[in-house]
Amino acid sequence: MTDDQITELLFVREEPVRADLAMVFGAANEADLARRTRQGVRLYREGYVPRLLVTGGGVLALTRPEAARMADLARQVGVPVADLLVEARSNTTFANARDSRDLLRERGLLEGLATVLLVSSEWLMRRVLLTVQATFPRGIRFVCCPTTEGCTRENWTASEACRREVIQESELLLAFHGPIAARP
């Protein structure tokens, strides 16, 4: 695949709209975790969403769950506890989506859900989008509102580290989702 094809395959960035909540995906990397949390908080503060759902248990059992750390960061900058939903068991993108869906169902929020803003790193947005579309009930609109820091569509080819991650993600996405992923 060419760099342009990889860019079109992976990088999804849409303008935020008013939504029922923002679903903020965790990250093992602390800098990515902070960037994603900041983006979720920005969407909350700007009035796009009335609540944040932070999701991620973390890969290492020895560390505090990603979602708990994100909730702490959000509270430190003024997001009230009442406006935070915390899903702290999952450790894969699929588990993030499944466990978040289940949490929303348990809280009685899934049935009325119309629009959800998705927050992750931009180069992971296609995977996130395909996963939530496959996991959540049909009819929910998902809008990709990634961080604009780190590896982005504008800069990923300039950094060898970003380039490695992005190429690996494109290969994994095509292997896992096949032709569905290739039709953005």
Predicted feature locations:
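A structural signal for short, hydrophobic/glycine-enriched beta-strand patches
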Residues: 1-166
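Glycine-rich flexible loop motifs, especially short His-Gly-Gly/GGXG/HXGH segments used as catalytic or interaction
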Residues: 157-184
